[in-house]
Amino acid sequence: MNTAAAAPNPSALKLKHLATVLHDPVRWRILRELSKGDALPVWVLAGLARSSAPKVSKHMAVLRKAGLVAVGYGRLYKLAPGFQPEAGGARLDLGHCVLKLDTEF
């Protein structure tokens, strides 16, 4: 009996990681707000995401590591260039899936 596991598919691993990152309701609300197109500071995102600024800072680090958001001048956060929303916002094309961010988590 061969018990060796097949090598994991790299895109499947990325999707699994993204699913883990996006599973958090605060991160979902942050992405939904950023999908509207504005670059925002942590304190504004904290209010919009109904969380504290220190917690949102930690969430932003996770989203940055996943490549979903970028930080610019003045520590303003926005969606990473590859994930800019379509006109009207609330929709992000991640390549292997499209997120509709117009729903509450």
What are these model-derived regions, one by one?
Residues 70-71:
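Short beta-strand "wing" residues that participate in macromolecule-binding interfaces
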Residues 1-13:
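Long, low-complexity, charged/polar intrinsically disordered regions in eukaryotic proteins
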Residues 36, 78-105:
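Conserved segment of winged-helix/HTH DNA-binding domains
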Residues 13-21, 25-54, 75-84:
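N-terminal helix-turn-helix DNA-binding core of bacterial DNA-binding proteins
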Residues 64:
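Helix-to-catalytic-loop junction in kinase catalytic cores
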Residues 60-61:
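Short, hydrophobic-biased segments on the C-terminal half of alpha helices
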Residues 67:
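Glycine-centered, phosphate/nucleic-acid-interacting loop/turn motifs that mediate DNA/RNA or nucleotide
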